[in-house]
Regions:
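Compact beta-sheet-dominated globular domain cores
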Residues: 64-122
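An acidic, glycine-rich, mixed-charge low-complexity segment common to nucleic-acid enzymes
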Residues: 1-62
Length: 122
């Protein structure tokens, strides 16, 4: 599966920003408006992935192929989280599910193959 940057990503911001597990994973990020930060970073990530499709790393979870997309929330340069997305059944958009630490994302991606992307390292 190759990421299509022209498709919209529907994000479950409430789940991502109110879920205890996600908040724990993002505890080092200091920002008063995480929703705005996340929205801006998702737009930046889409531009980066459109320039280099290998940044979108596949993972297999709950009988589906999903993509892990790098998010650089702390400094805007170094990935510190992975956004999990899957293509909708209609194929018209991606559904953003959650954010994972890089360690969890790497372990999930390894179930398919060793990730070729240089942002997702153990």
């Amino acid at each position: 599966m190759i990421f299509n940057p022209n498709l919209q990503i529907n994000i479950q911001y409430r789940h991502i920003l109110e879920d205890e597990g996600n908040l724990e994973r993002m505890k080092s990020i200091t920002c008063k408006n995480l929703t705005s930060l996340l929205r801006g970073e998702i737009e930046m990530m889409k531009m980066k992935v459109s320039a280099n499709y290998k940044l979108a790393v596949p993972q297999y979870y709950q009988h589906k192929i999903q993509l892990l997309l790098p998010l650089c929330l702390e400094d805007g340069k170094t990935p510190d989280m992975a956004l999990v997305v899957s293509k909708s059944d209609s194929g018209k958009y991606y559904q953003g599910h959650t954010c994972l630490t890089l360690e969890i994302a790497y372990n999930n991606a390894r179930l398919i193959a060793k990730p070729e992307s240089n942002w997702l390292v153990p």
